[in-house]
Amino acid sequence: MDSATTIKQPPPPEAVVIQMVMGAWVSKVISDVTRLNVPDVLKQHGSMSAAEMIARHGVEARPECLERALRACASLGIFTESATGEFGPTKLSDALTMDSPVSVKKLVESLAGSWWKVWTGLCDAIRTGEPQARNQLGMEWWDYLKANPKEMEDFGEAMKSNSLSSMKGVLEKCDFTNSKKVVDVGGGFGHLIIALLEKYSGLRGTVLDVPELIPIAKKNIQVNDPGISSRLEYIGGDMFKSVPPADVYVMKHIIHDWDDGRCIRLLRNCHQSMTGDGRVICVDAVLAPMGDTAGTPAKLLDCNMMVFISGKERTKVQWDELYQAAGFQIHTITSLRDNFGTSIIEGVKK
């Protein structure tokens, strides 16, 4: 070996740990630059300096401070950076724009707002076993959303962007050809139901969610095709009390929001209202079993459930226990192979 050859040594353990911990800084700088609308400005108008963004396109910031934040983002690959101080769009920044077909803008912006506040209580959640939304926001998370319509609307948009791959998975992996009616429990704005009604002309669909969300959903979703609108309904209600009759119930990122007792109650409601030889289809993470260290994002999502609400992500064994307790048995588990270990857990009556 040439004596001049440099052998790259792995970073020391403390450097690796510090890099991990700095992930909080990464999240915050990307989220806040997105809230300042920089990705949209660059997509629409092309490369420019921080000063130009402020002077010509209404970005509210101090030039030097914005430039420093943009340089940090450029080093992460979010933007390009020239020697003359101009920043440009990339494929990554496009995902942070409002009109991107894979937009995560609202989700990323939410992470910089109230979500960030609640996460400061993680240590207390670990110590006490209690969710920390009340301590950080003054009320429980779901009550906070009800009391803040704009936050609820943003949350709905965030969940839409967060569930695009899940929605695609349901459309591709689940067959509704012989189904008559599907209820999307906790269905938010109704994007999944509408997509199903577009694909299956003989299907009827219901979105069940909290009453406070229904007018927001109807405002945000305009269905101009009478062939679809005539088969679509929105119902405001309490899923823990009852669910509308149907032969298929879909719950996309719903079960992980709740403790085992409430999940079993919800699944039993579906069991009792289910018509014919129906199905329940849950879309959520399936955690790796103990001893398997794979699936970091899903395990971080599990911590997110812990600090916010009384929910959690579950292993295959835990999913089976929930279904069995509610009168179902797991028929299939189909992995969507995304970062969060999301799977479609389909159950039938025992």
Q: Whereabouts are the PLM-identified features?
A:
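Conserved Class I S-adenosyl-L-methionine-dependent methyltransferase catalytic core
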Residues: 4-8, 13-59, 63-181, 341
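Short conserved AdoMet
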Residues: 43, 175, 200-201, 275
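Short glycine-centered segments of the SAM/dcSAM-binding site in methyltransferase folds
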Residues: 181, 277-281
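Class I SAM-dependent methyltransferase SAM/SAH-binding core
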Residues: 181-183, 188-241
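A short SAM/SAH-binding and catalytic strip from SAM-dependent methyltransferases
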Residues: 245-262
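A short glycine-rich, Lys/Arg-flanked "PGG" loop and its adjoining helix->strand segment in the class I
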Residues: 264-276
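C-terminal alpha-helical "lid/dimerization" subdomain adjacent to the S-adenosyl-L-methionine
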Residues: 281-326
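Core SAM-dependent methyltransferase catalytic element
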Residues: 328-350
